[in-house]
Every structure is written in structure tokens, then in C-alpha cells.
Amino acid sequence: MRAENLRELRDIKLTAAAPVSLNDLLRTEIPVRLCREVSNGKIRRLIMAGAVRLDGVPCRNPSALVRAGASVSVRVDVGKLFYEKPVNDIAFELTARDVLYEDEYIIVVNKPACFPTEAGMVASRDNLHAAVVRYLFANARRSRPNLRNPPYAGIMHRLDRETSGVILFTKSREVNAACHALFEERVAQKTYRAVVSPAPRRMRCSVEMFMGRISPKSQPAKWGAVAERDGGVYARTDISVVAQGDLGGKPIAFVECRPHTGRTHQIRVHLASLGAPILGDVLYGGQRYARIMLHAQTLSFPHPVTHEPISITAPLPSGFDL
């Protein structure tokens, strides 16, 4: 039997009782009609995909006003709507060897590649934040075996799923504001190592541009150059070539990146703009590889409580040096 014959198509017809946005109407009614929870992201994808008609006219605007008495029809491919792309996250449990620094206020760990920093839309998907909480809980219960509530761990910054390296969590809400300020005010200094192909033309350079999202919300998030007048935000990265080599007959370079700002996908976009995309970063023109070869190597900052300078380095994973 052909796959399309197995699709479950549902035609849902709605009438607005009062003025409401299209997105809000569907968020309320679609879960009721399908008898299951539907995330806001899935509702928006339905709209953006052209599955919704407002008074018989296709409507792709989630914010469109639906007047009282207006008719809305939705064609739902149930299987496609609830399909979750299988993830190939690694299985990971935080151990003492993954902890780069810890005191009563903060914990800094070495994040593995191919493991998300925090929880996403799939509730059952493991993540580093959950692993840190489990680690802290297990340690706390060694001295207090009857402890029932897991300890607090605050996310201060994030790394992309495929990026490895240094990441900081707080252990107390009281230091959150001070830690947030370290990153918001660019007091914390970060150094990344990347493997690119081909090598940048210059051994040292700084990339400066205004950045923003350049892909539609219905597609995977992609960032790039966006003029300031169009909402772009300033971003700068200092880049230097550490070494050059060869991989399967193709030239590669090992580069050090020092971001002065913290924009989404900043280093990936800046390296791609030099014609030297990161190995494995297919979204930005890189060659296919087992992972995106980007590693957060060093994080330096004054301690949020003692103000003593701290510099923490995560060892380079295999493949990041000659």
C-alpha cells in the first residue's frame, strides 16, 4: 500500500463566536477537535503551510483577525502534524570528570556534542540541564538520603546542540542576576575552536555585521546579514587561524574565534561569510560531517560572588587539532 493512502486527513470547520486572532482560535479549537494537545508551533506551521482558509480564502497570517461569525476551515494531515523527526542525541550522564569547576554558587561543565542544552518541544528528550540537576541531586542525597526535592540549576547561557564545551549553570537563584549581567554586559569572555573548510584567506581578521533571522518562521532557523534599519543587531567576532591541514584530500583550517557579542549562530554565520564554513555545518554551506565542528574552549569571568577572576578551559575533543 502506498504511503499516501495511509494518511489521516481531517477537515475541521469552525465559526468564530467573537472577534479573535486566527492563531488564538486554532489554539483553542484544534486540540478539542483532535482530542490531543497541539503546541503553538504546530498551529503556526498549519497556518504557514496554507492549510487554513478564512471565509473560503487561504490565510497564512497567524495574527489575522477572525470576525464574529466568520468561518474557518482547516485541513489537517494528522500524521504529518504530529510527526517528530527522530533525534540522534547521544546518551549522556554527567559525572565528576565532566565538571570543570564547582563551588556553592555555580557549576561549570563540559557539554558533549550532539546533546541539547535544555528541554525542547519533545518532553521525553534528555538534555544537559536535566543531567546537571540529576548530578547535583545525587550528590546532595549522599549526605541527605531523605532529600525529596531536586536542587536548583539555572541556565545562564546556551550552546547549540552540536556544539561542545564550557557552559555555566548557577546553583542558587540568588546569584542569577549577577551571572546574567556577566553575559549581558559582555564581561564574560569566550573563546571557541572551529574546524573549517576551506581556510579563510586571511590568518587574522574581525568580522562585523548586523545580523537577524533570514529564514521564514515555517522553516529551520537560519541567520545572516540584515541591515540595522530592518531590525538587524550588531555582531563582531575576532578570528585567527591556528593551524592548517588536510582531511580526505580537502584543505581544512583550525581557527580560534573570540565573539564580542552573543548573537544566535554568530560564529557559524561569520565564518561562512568568509567563505570558510564550519565542517559539518550544512545549514551554512559546510561539508557534511559527523557533527558541527565547533567547541566552546574557554570561558573567563569574575566570580559572581567573590569577584575573583576565573578562567575555565574544556579539553579539545578529537579532531580539533592536528
Pin down the residues of each PLM region.
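RNA pseudouridine synthases
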Residues: M1-L322
